[in-house]
């Protein structure tokens, strides 16, 4: 092949980011191709739309598939480069004046066919150089994929911890305000209990804040280690075949050790102490709720709320579900326009439920209409994925860092004060009070259970 034509051919197989032959090439929407590792490293912090460095068009960084044809062509180009290298006078076997085509995996040396059959190498494991190089490169790519998945997981966890740390003090203050407000409704002799519970809450809040900072620092440090190891593997992958084989060493073992002991996000719980006489006070407003059952599809508002929730103060701390759910609703037959009302729901050890009250027009809303979680829906919910079980309240959406109730949960509706309070009946403790509710009476009780 004419050398000029060969150069043009080889030039089409060069990644524009690393300027080496493609390694596991991916082609994005605009038609330009990059090494997958180069693409990952350059656009790691851009989760959805990325701008092509060649044409500036935007594309989605999801479901990238290897361009098999381009990968085969790049492999062929490396073989041509290897053949040119091995054909040079300097690489000829000094003893037999033959081309070195064999790689000895024991002492990592290049041999001609006669040397590989000698007494010294006869019992060693041998491979053709181009086969051995591609095999080693594939091992590196497999390890890089595992490493990158862990790096992405760590990156998500770091975002979780960063968000939690940023909003933790505000969350603690909200809990303190809610408990103070509850004690103001109790007799004066509860003053010492109130003081004790608030002090314990402050102390626990500071401890968790410190632990969040430590967890965040560990994850940031682990992120640097993972990225550094990934870059080292990527650099090794791009080496010429002979250099790759001779420099391979213990890099796979070292990369495996990096994957051990990955830091996990904290699961902070800021439990509040029991409030003496809380249930007795609320039982003065006890009502019996009669429910009307119906089944709803996955487009209903509650599922939209669960899907929209992500970790921390930015509503992003609740597990994301990809499965299609079946949602079972139970509406209260009664409606409320004024006054104070209290009722309880038995939740036991279950999860993926929510209950509360909603503005009456909610029930008549078009199911296909996009739902704003801040609009007329006042719920306590519990959802679970494989990792954690999380409590949240709505209006606005907010994660509640408290232990999950294990028996009965009470709801206290105060139409005049425009508040909805949830209590852990077993613990006689306040879960949370939703303040300044945008009530549009009549209000209707609601219970929902979602099956994934």
UniProtKB/Swiss-Prot annotation:
> At which positions is Zn(2+) bound?
93, 96, 115, 121
- The B box-type zinc finger ranges are 88-129
> What residues does the B30.2/SPRY domain cover?
269-452
- Write the protein's name: Tripartite motif-containing protein 49C
PANTHER family assigned = E3 UBIQUITIN-PROTEIN LIGASE TRIM
Q: Which Gene3D superfamilies match?
A: 2.60.120.920, Classic Zinc Finger (3.30.160.60), Zinc/RING finger domain, C3HC4 (zinc finger) (3.30.40.10)
Q: Name one GO biological process term.
A: regulation of gene expression
Q: Which GO terms describe its molecular function?
A: ubiquitin protein ligase activity; zinc ion binding
Does the UniProt entry include the keyword Zinc? yes
Gene behind the chain: TRIM49C
Please provide an example of a Pfam family that matches this protein in its UniProt record. zf-B_box
Q: Which residues cross the membrane?
A: none
Q: Where are the zinc fingers (RING-type)?
A: 15-56
**Which species is this record about?**
Homo sapiens
């Amino acid at each position: 092949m004419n050398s000029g034509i060969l150069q043009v051919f080889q030039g089409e197989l060069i990644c524009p980011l690393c300027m080496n032959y493609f390694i596991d090439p991916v082609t994005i929407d605009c038609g330009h191709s990059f090494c997958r590792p180069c693409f990952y490293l350059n656009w790691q912090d851009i989760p959805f739309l990325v701008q092509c460095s060649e044409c500036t068009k935007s594309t989605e960084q999801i479901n990238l598939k290897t361009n098999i044809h381009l990968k085969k062509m790049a492999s062929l180009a490396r073989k041509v480069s290897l053949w040119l290298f091995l054909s040079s006078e300097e690489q000829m076997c000094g003893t037999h004046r033959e081309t070195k085509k064999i790689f000895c995996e024991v002492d990592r040396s290049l041999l001609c066919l006669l040397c590989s059959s000698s007494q010294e190498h006869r019992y060693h494991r041998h491979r053709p150089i181009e086969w051995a190089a591609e095999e080693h490169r594939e091992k590196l790519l497999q390890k890089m994929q595992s490493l990158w998945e862990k790096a992405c997981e760590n990156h998500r966890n770091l975002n979780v911890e960063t968000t939690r740390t940023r909003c933790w003090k505000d969350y603690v203050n909200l809990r303190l305000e809610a408990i103070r407000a509850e004690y103001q409704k109790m007799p004066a002799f509860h003053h010492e209990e109130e003081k004790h519970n608030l002090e314990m809450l402050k102390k626990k809040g500071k401890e968790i804040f410190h632990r969040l900072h430590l967890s965040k620092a560990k994850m940031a440090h682990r992120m640097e280690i993972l990225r550094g190891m990934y870059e080292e593997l990527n650099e090794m992958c791009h080496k010429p075949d002979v250099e790759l084989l001779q420099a391979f060493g213990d890099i796979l073992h070292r990369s495996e050790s990096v994957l051990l002991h990955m830091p996990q996000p904290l699961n902070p719980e800021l439990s509040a102490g029991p409030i003496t006489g809380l249930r007795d006070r609320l039982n003065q407003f006890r009502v019996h709720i009669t429910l009307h059952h119906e089944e709803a599809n996955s487009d209903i508002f509650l599922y939209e709320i669960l899907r929209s929730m992500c970790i921390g103060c930015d509503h992003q701390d609740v597990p994301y579900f990809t499965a299609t759910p079946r949602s079972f609703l139970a509406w209260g037959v009664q409606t409320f326009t004024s006054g104070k009302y209290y009722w309880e729901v038995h939740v036991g050890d279950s999860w993926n439920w929510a209950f509360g009250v909603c503005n009456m027009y909610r029930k008549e809303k078009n199911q296909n209409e996009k739902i704003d979680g801040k609009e007329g829906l006042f719920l306590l919910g519990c959802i679970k994925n494989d990792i954690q079980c999380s409590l949240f309240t709505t209006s606005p959406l907010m994660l509640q860092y408290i232990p999950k109730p294990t028996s009965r949960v009470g709801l206290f509706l105060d139409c005049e004060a425009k508040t909805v309070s949830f209590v852990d009946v077993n613990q006689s403790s306040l879960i949370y009070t939703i303040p300044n509710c945008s009530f549009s009476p009549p209000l209707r009780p609601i219970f929902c259970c979602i099956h994934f």
